[in-house]
Each structure stands twice: as C-alpha cells, then as structure tokens.
Amino acid sequence: PSATPPAPPPAPLAGRATTQLVFSVTLPPLSVSTFFVRSLSENEVAQTTALAEAAEETGASESDTNDGRAVSVSLDPNDGSLLVDFVVDATFNLTAKITAAFYASHDGSDGFVPSGAYVFRPDSSQKATPLGTPSFDPAASRVFRSGVLAETRVAFGDWASVAVRTWSKERVPHAEVEWTVGPIPVEADGVGKEVIVRYSTGLATGGTWATDSNGRDMQPRRRDHRDDWTFRNASEEPVSSNYYPFGSIATLTGDERAGFHLLTDRSQGVGSIRDGELEAMVHRRNLNDDWLGVGEPMNETQCGCRECDCPGLVARGTHLIAATTPATGPRTYRELQTRSQNPTQLAFAKVNGWEESIRGGSRRAVSVFASGAAPRNVHVVSIDRLPGEDCARGGACARIVLAHLFESEGCVGYDEELSAPAEVNLADFFPGRSIVAVEELTLSGTPIRPGDAVVTLEPMQIRAAKVEFA
C-alpha cells in the first residue's frame, strides 16, 4: 500500500513539492531495489485501494490517536502539544510531550561574548518562549491515516511545525518526528532566536542523561557537574552550560522504570535542563557577531545576503524517539541509529515502457550480502573496491570495515546479550567469490599484519581488512 499526504508547511517556496509519496517496502542489506511510480487515471484511482490517498482530518481532538502496536499519538486538548504514548512493558506506559520553543540570543551587552556562529549563549534572564498561540487552535492540527502510516501534524504559529509518524509493520517500535522551522522572524523585535524541540517524559532521571561520542561510546552526563573540576557556572549560564553535542543518540537514564531515546539525523546540541526532559536545538538565527573570527552574525537568508529584507532559511529534519526498559535500551537505539545515520540512497530516472520492465523482473532486489552475513551487533561501515595496483596477486580485491555496535559491561551502552564478542566470516559478504588472502589494515588503510577470513570484534571495536579474490 501507499499514500500521498500533502507536504508539510510552512508557506510554499519556489519549486517546492506539494505532495509526498510514502509506501512500505522491505530492503535487503546493501541491495539495489527498483520501484516504478506513475500517476493513475481517475478510473484506476477508483478501482485501486492500494494507492488510496491518506484520509485527512482537521481540528484533531483528544480522541484522535494514531494507533501503532506499541506507540500511539494524540493531541493535548489544553495546549495542542503532541503526546506520544509508548507501551514500555506490561506494567508501565511512558508518555512523551513534544513542544517547540525558542531562546532569545544574548546580544553581548553585558560585555561578555554574544550568541553567534561558534557560541550558544541565550539570554539567561528569560525562559524559553513556547512557539504557537497562547490558546490551542484546533485548526492548526492535521491527522492523516492510511495503511502505511499514521501522521499527526501540528503547526506552531506560522513558521514552525512538527509532524509525528508511526509506521505499520514496524520491527522496532518508535515514532518519527519531522520538524520544520523557518523563516525565523527577527525583523519585528530585532532579537536573534535559538529554536528547540523539547521532549518531556516525567521520568525521574536525577539530572542524568547520556549522549554519543562521534556516534560510538555513550558518555554519561550530569546536570551542573563536571568530573574533573568544580562547576560554578550553573547560575550564570544554566542552559548553555548544560548543552552537549550529539551526532546520533541522546538517552535519558536514571529511572528504573524506563529509558527514553532521541536520535537525530544530523549533529545538534542537546540538553536535559529539567529532569525527564531532552531538548535539541534544531535551528538558529543570530544578529550579533560572536567576536571569534568570522566577523559577521549567523544571519543566513534565502538570498544569501545579511543586510537585506530577504527571509531567513527554512530548516527541516527528523528525530526518532523510542521508550524501552533500561535493559533493552541499547539494542533499540543502536538499531535506530543505523537507520538514522545511514538513510537509503535514492536515485530517479524517467522510464519508458515500464510495464515491460516490470514483466522483465527489474523490480527484483539485488543484494551483495549472503543472508545473515552481519550479526545483529555488527555494523558494516563500508565496503570499497580497490584499484588493481593495490591487489598484490593481480586479481580483484576489496576493503571492508566492520564495527561492533555495543559497549562493555559497566558502560551506558551495555547489552547483556549483544555486548558479547561478535564473530564474522568475511566470505559471507562476498558470495560467489573465492577469498585467497586477507590482510588486516588500520582504519586509514595502512597494512598491519596477515589476517584471517574469520574476524572477531570485541565491544566497540572497529576493524578493517583488505580481501583478495581468486
């Protein structure tokens, strides 16, 4: 089945799509799959239920939910915020409230550095300002349902929106949060703005959370604390001093009932300013230079000018959110991480005679791997075909890089089952080829020692090898 919900706001830009096409497929690992898309005639639309448009409802109420097996979405009737309910286990459900807000950028009038390209420094005399109208406007919400997905969308004023999607037949229960922000208005008040999406869960986290380090080890964080020096900055900079970079994963820890996990499709700043909350900065527009060398404010516009009336940039991105028991958290966020950080690569071409192509079998997926080549705790970082001069025996050769996804016992990312050492047979990645030699490499490609076709990876280990074929 497929669906064609309208594209999300804000106001249309030149050349911007007005409709989305969504459909559900199964893609084998490292494979090439071909799909044919065409417009149906009115008669075909009437006869074809598989390509029916998603139903749309306006002014969703408290009873409007997107039903997934373990995830449902509704709207708070009091303020219109999005509520995502997760079934953690038989005894506990966790509800995450999604809101959007902005911090006013500090202008540096106190003699210290202003907020800018290299510095996040909000005006600490003000709390984050919620986006949207003071009273909930039901017309600002939309609900779409189809056999493929259920989507609830809320507009926060006229320059920000959030859509939450749940997909049918999902192996790892989670919700997809698509945020769209911009153009950020600064003309009326002359104040720069730092826009966040906030997730409030009610978990008793005791000021603790964790973020990834370059997508690998999870680093414990504690509010208003540093392990190796006395922290004295909490009262002056309570927000920015508790922000950390995360390129992939942030997770709330400390509550024995559940963990809440946030995954991003790009590097962002994240903080847990209050217990049970995570907030990610998604967009910024500053009006002051931060005195750190650029010599201009981070005031990006659609025209590329800064001293002009052109509107600011529109940014769009995706978060994945999930809630689990503490024990199953690492396996959930590591699997979602591989999806978020390694999206499917898309290519498009105009096709003539598509019916003949379908009958000829060109829809069939072509996969490089043998079934089950990579264990669940191993990620294939890359496979590269090497030039002939790098192949000592004059034949074909390739470089493969493998990474263990889980951490050792005692670490945040430890999983009782999947943190065990993983054994991989390189021959499974090259079905139909005969391996004659294996050489272990550094990650930069320098030879280390002769290797073996069977490779063992310890927790968090990354290994590279050159494989030569007969």
Where are the predicted features?
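C-terminal (or distal) subdomains of carbohydrate-active enzymes
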Residues: 1-470
